[in-house]
Swiss-Prot record:
Protein name (record): GTPase Era
SUPFAM superfamilies: P-loop containing nucleoside triphosphate hydrolases (SSF52540), Prokaryotic type KH domain (KH-domain type II) (SSF54814)
Localization terms from the record: Cytoplasm; Cell inner membrane
Subunit-level organization: Monomer.
Region of interest called G4, as start-end residue ranges on this chain: 116-119
Keyword check for GTP-binding: yes
GO biological-process terms attached to the record: ribosomal small subunit assembly
Organism of origin: Campylobacter jejuni (strain RM1221)
Disulfide bridges in this chain: none
Residue numbers binding GTP: 10-17, 57-61, 116-119
Length: 291
């Protein structure tokens, strides 16, 4: 029996959250084509044969001077020192520059490369990309082609990860899908619905705070605040006669209900907090692992 923690690292939009969801075969991690959709570290628990692997999905690595983005990168780097194995995720279409940047951080634990989205390319392109990574072979333990859409890739990746975990009793109940709090997951589903329903720029000025939860045997009651930075953005989030906010709520309610396996009553409010993305204390509260 082995058990350990695996930090998933990579640039924004490399497919980290989609990879976690495919390993779980459940929707846990927020998935969006927009950069830095993942703002908190989500712990997802995967049982592989008799072994327990706890994946930590981190914000994407990138370069930016904005306070929020700086804190996101700090969070990702910190997770590298708090794990047993690092899984570096890169798309088969990415250059190796992102991997070189990762190596410059001097990771101190073993790492494996997951070359993602291989179902979208041909064998010749895949072989060319593998040869590009070959010059770094002294650094990584293995490079594994992966597709989140094909289950046949799952076993090979998990088998490789387990090699580098220690013998240890389970850290979590094997029935659990995630060690992240339910509030974090509900928050991410609401934020994802904002990403899906609004233009590219607006979601970056928005955050979600869960104000109240009440869980009964047949009904989950949630109240949440959508934080945005201007009155004009507030108007866009609400929409004409509340249509946009209703659509966001409907989409989020469906996702939360699927996870909770019960009916959900979701009440959403929109609040303006100017310059929240530059308020370091507010951001640290948002990004706190225990939040």
């Amino acid at each position: 029996m082995k058990s350990g923690f695996v930090s998933i690292i990579g640039r924004t939009n490399a497919g980290k959250s989609t990879l976690i969801n495919s390993l779980l075969e459940e929707k846990i991690a927020l998935v969006s084509h927009k950069q830095n959709a993942t703002r908190r570290k989500i712990k997802a628990i995967v049982m592989h044969e008799k072994n327990q692997i706890i994946f930590i999905d981190t914000p994407g690595l990138h370069e930016s001077g904005a306070t929020l983005n700086q804190l996101l990168v700090q969070s990702a780097i910190k997770s590298m020192g708090d794990c047993d194995v690092i899984l570096f995720v890169a798309s088969v279409f990415d250059s190796t520059k992102d991997y070189e940047n990762f190596l410059s951080l001097n990771p101190q634990v073993p790492h494996i490369i997951a070359l993602n989205k291989v179902d979208l390319t041909d064998n010749a392109t895949l072989l060319k990309k593998l040869s590009e990574y070959a010059k770094f072979s002294q650094h990584f333990k293995a490079i594994i082609p992966y597709s989140s859409k094909k289950k046949s890739y799952k076993k090979g990746l998990l088998d490789e990860i387990v090699k580098y975990l220690d013998e240890h009793e389970y850290f979590y109940n094997p029935e659990f899908l995630s060690a992240s709090s339910e509030k974090e997951l509900y928050r991410d589903f609401i934020l994802e619905s904002i990403y899906e329903n609004l233009s590219d720029e607006l979601p970056y000025s928005s955050e979600v705070l869960i104000n109240r939860t009440k869980d009964t045997p047949n009904l989950l009651i949630l109240e949440a605040n959508i934080i945005t930075d201007t009155n004009s953005h507030k108007g866009m989030l609400i929409g004409k006669e509340g249509a946009t906010l209703k659509r966001i709520g409907k989409d989020a309610r469906f996702k939360i209900s699927k996870l909770a396996q019960k009916k959900v009553l979701l009440k959403l409010f929109v609040t303006v907090k100017k310059n929240w993305q530059k308020d370091e204390e507010f951001l640290k509260k948002l990004l706190n692992d225990e939040n």
